[in-house]
């Protein structure tokens, strides 16, 4: 629900878990702050939102390695470095909303790169994120700003 409006979403292939772990395929249970928007400026103009917004660049990735000091943070990836690339050809990360799951404090192995992002056309399960159609995500973005929260629950 967004206010009084129901918006269909796709969740992680393992459902919703309170004890999220890295790579478990689950969407974390809890209440999280909406932090910022990342978007592909080469594909669309900056979406209407009150959130802080940042352009996704080719080298931008999200650290998923629990042993790395950059864990669950964005970083500029070199050609051979692992990480969840935000610059994707499939359009799933054309709009990415970062939430506060495992951010303060960051705990190694408790899950990283949990976003709201664009759903696959067939609406298949995610690796743990919350996915929406691009039009629904754009409509939602127009209503989001600093201080907005998301409740993820069964």
Question: Language model features by range: what are they?
Answer:
Residues 132:
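A conserved hydrophobic position in a structured secondary element of the catalytic/binding core
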Residues 1-126, 138-154:
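Cell wall/extracellular polymer interaction/catalysis modules
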Residues 129:
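Short cysteine clusters
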């Amino acid at each position: 629900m967004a206010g009084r409006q129901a918006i269909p979403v796709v969740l992680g292939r393992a459902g919703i878990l309170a004890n999220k772990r890295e790579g478990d395929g689950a969407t974390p249970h809890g209440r999280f702050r909406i932090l910022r928007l990342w978007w592909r400026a080469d594909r669309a103009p900056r979406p209407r939102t009150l959130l802080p917004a940042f352009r996704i660049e080719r080298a931008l990735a999200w650290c998923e390695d629990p042993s790395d000091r950059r864990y669950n943070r964005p970083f500029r990836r070199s050609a051979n470095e692992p990480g969840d690339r935000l610059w994707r050809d499939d359009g799933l990360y054309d709009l990415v909303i970062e939430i506060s799951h495992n951010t303060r404090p960051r705990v190694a192995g408790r899950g990283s790169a949990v976003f709201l992002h664009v759903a696959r056309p067939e609406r298949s399960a995610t690796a743990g994120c919350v996915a929406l159609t691009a039009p629904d995500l754009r409509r939602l973005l127009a209503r989001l700003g600093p201080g907005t929260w998301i409740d993820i629950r069964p």
